[in-house]
């Protein structure tokens, strides 16, 4: 889902026997991964890695209310589908192991997780599927950007969901994936 697709794509590029198919769910524009750390992003990373201040910032950003707000405004199209059990699981996961998640957040904020995937997309030798939510205002542009990179890339849209269709409408997402796989078999 989302930015994690860069790691999978680059792993496939390095060893093309790792995967048989790749499914990207709501990935950002492939060009988004072509960033390098700036002075401000490096400062954000450094602040998050400072022991007391960084932990405080991390705890504020991963506070229960902020996680709930993220689900209600960005992750789910229908906020009522975000169960308290799901929200609790996300909150607990963000605070396991002594808040070491702040180092991942620091790397993301510092743009250290952005790895250019354009060259890897062009060299694909396996099916690569992009499933994009229609709720994303840039969905057409994103899908078009991926599709023009390689003939191995197939695309589909999913409606009435936002960023996490695997949680919001798993049956609908499974149907879209099944449809993509059937299209490949023909």
Tell me the role of every PLM-derived stretch.
Residues 33-38, 142-144, 168-170:
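Short aromatic-enriched loop/helix-cap "lid" or pocket-rim segments at secondary-structure transitions
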Residues 33-36, 58-123:
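Conserved alpha/beta-hydrolase catalytic His-Asp/Glu region
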Residues 23-26, 105-107, 129-133, 157:
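Short beta-strand segments
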Residues 1-9:
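Glycine-rich nucleophile elbow surrounding the catalytic serine of serine-hydrolase chemistry
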Residues 123-161:
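Conserved loop-alpha-helix segment in the C-terminal half of the alpha/beta-hydrolase fold
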Residues 151-186:
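Catalytic active-site module of serine/aspartate enzymes centered on a nucleophile-bearing elbow/loop
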């Amino acid at each position: 889902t989302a930015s994690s697709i860069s790691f999978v794509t680059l792993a496939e590029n390095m060893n093309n026997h790792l995967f048989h198919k790749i499914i990207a769910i709501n990935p950002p524009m492939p060009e988004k991964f072509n960033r390098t750390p700036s002075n401000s992003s490096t400062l954000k990373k450094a602040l998050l890695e400072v022991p007391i201040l960084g932990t405080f910032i991390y705890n504020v950003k991963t506070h229960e209310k902020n996680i709930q707000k993220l689900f209600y405004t960005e992750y789910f199209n229908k906020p009522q589908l975000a169960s308290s059990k799901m929200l609790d699981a996300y909150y607990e996961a963000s605070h396991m192991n002594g808040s070491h998640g702040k180092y991942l957040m620091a790397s993301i904020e510092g743009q250290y997780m952005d790895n250019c995937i354009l060259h890897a997309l062009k060299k694909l030798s396996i099916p690569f599927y992009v499933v994009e939510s229609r709720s994303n205002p840039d969905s057409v542009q994103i899908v078009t950007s991926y599709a023009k990179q390689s003939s191995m890339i197939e695309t589909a849209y999913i409606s009435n969901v936002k960023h996490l269709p695997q949680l919001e409408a798993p049956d609908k997402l499974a149907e879209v994936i099944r449809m993509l796989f059937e299209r490949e078999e023909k």
